[in-house]
Design a protein with these regions (language model features):
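Conserved beta-strand hairpin/beta-sheet module of binuclear metal-dependent hydrolase folds
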Residues: 9-76, 176-190
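Active-site metal-binding loops of divalent metal-dependent hydrolases
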Residues: 9-10, 52-54, 92, 113-114, ...
């Protein structure tokens, strides 16, 4: 079985309407966004990282607040980034695929169609390329040429108990991660649902490439979790840190494999 830690590295203050496509009752209410990477600790000390966050340079460019750089988040729980051998990139948006150079010994797991999307004709449109940072995409392509990228076509496996599931929607090749844990099959939905409320209300986050695929992705996440929505983890919701216990001695690290408080 695997342990799963959500590591918060940044945040952004914003209003509720910024996080939904359709109108909400109180659009001006505060609804901040947290930014996470996820560390999976498996049998015999195996480590898998899900997503790589963004750099301080990108934070300044996009008006985000870094609380602790991703490398420092990992070191705070005793993990040397150079020791990580497998990194899952759920998609290539700036907040999920920066800092690739922090992981010189890792293989990067990504969907075929996400790389095609991020390097193809859709990037000729500003509205579609806005969530990407070109230097992040270039680093991924350099990793391809260095034989350090593992491509997946829909379903895939990173390690026993860690599987990948392509759903698209938010980005052309978004993938979710399913992890075998002591409390059941945990699903890192990531940006298939930024907040619990996106999925619960069926009101999508407004950055979306394929709306139909996003809606089907919510259903897929529930199914992968065996119908237990407490096992579906959204990509950016501050409620994650309220619902689950912190790693002892590190309040920015949250243990998702342990039972939620409620």
């Amino acid at each position: 079985m695997w342990e799963v830690l959500a590591l918060r590295y940044a945040r952004h203050d914003r209003t509720a309407q910024s996080n939904f496509m359709m109108p909400v009752p109180d659009p001006h209410d505060a609804m901040p966004m947290d930014y996470f990477v996820w560390l999976l600790r498996g049998p015999e000390g195996r480590l898998v990282l899900v997503d790589t966050g963004f750099s301080e340079e990108t934070a300044a460019k996009r008006g985000r607040t870094i609380l602790r750089p991703v490398g420092d988040c990992l070191r705070a729980i005793g993990v040397d980034p150079a020791a990580i051998q497998d990194v899952v990139v759920t998609h290539l948006h700036y907040d999920h695929a920066g800092n690739l150079d922090l992981f010189p010994n890792a293989r990067f797991h990504i969907q075929d169609n996400e790389v095609s999307f991020a390097t193809g004709r859709h990037m000729c449109s500003h509205c579609l390329r806005h969530p990407f940072e070109v230097q992040d995409v270039v680093r991924l392509i350099r990793a391809v040429y260095a034989d350090r990228v593992v491509f997946h076509d829909g379903e895939g496996e990173v390690a026993p108990g860690v599987t990948l599931h392509g759903v698209g929607g938010h980005s052309g090749g978004l993938q979710m991660v399913r992890i075998a844990t002591a409390r059941g099959p945990l699903v890192i939905a990531g940006d298939a649902s930024h907040y619990y409320a996106n999925m619960a209300r069926e009101n999508p986050f407004p950055i979306v490439f394929d709306l139909g695929a996003m809606v089907q992705g919510w259903r897929r996440a529930r199914a992968l979790a065996g119908g237990d929505e407490s096992l579906v983890i959204p990509g950016h919701d501050p409620l994650v840190r309220i619902r689950f216990p912190a790693e002892p001695g590190n309040p920015e690290a949250t243990r998702l494999d342990l039972p939620p408080y409620s």
